[in-house]
Amino acid sequence: MIKDLYKTWNIQSHNIHGEEFTGYEPVYDQLDQLDKPAFNKDPEATVNKVFDIYRSINIVPILYFTEKGLINAIKEFKSTSYNAVKNSKISLGNNRGQPLSRFLFPNMMTAEPKGRGSNSLKDRFYNDTKLKRAIRICYEMREGHKLVYPTALRRALELVTGENIQNFKPQNARALVEHLCPVLWGNVYDYSAGYGGRLLGISCSN
């Protein structure tokens, strides 16, 4: 399975830097130098430099896993506490597991909003104009350090055009299924369980 995922994400052996990786670890020092003062001094040149760095590696900026890293991350996810359903409501939070879902379900990164062809998050990353727009968003809407690291860039790509496929939070799926079926080893039918975070959350429930 892991080889198929790597093929889908275009991950090569030289992109792997630890059990959890973005593939951009070797260029973090370069990205650190392209900070907010650098952008304020010369916005266009800074955006172009960041763009060139990302194109030099050219993989979608999400968190990836080795097989061992994936197993460890799923175990950690399963042992993490979460907000259960109370009075037919789930409290805010329950964000754990989202990086796992992005990696395990590439369809979440390639799904397109209805009527907007070539507008998936993956398409936006490989579109030069949209990638540069996302880089600019990183500088214009955030302060601090690591402004153009992969996580920040992914979030900015989600803002480009403003239309995104939303994943179901795995921990919310886990909370719902255990609320609906509190019996250990019970069965719940979910017609969309295979699409994204619902499958991860349900498979880690009781």
Language model: regions and residue ranges:
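N-terminal accessory regions of S-adenosyl-L-methionine
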Residues: 1-166
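Conserved alpha-helix/loop element of class I SAM-dependent methyltransferases that forms part
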Residues: 163-184
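Conserved SAM-binding loop of SAM-dependent methyltransferases across substrates and taxa
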Residues: 175, 195-205
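Conserved class I S-adenosyl-L-methionine
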Residues: 183-194
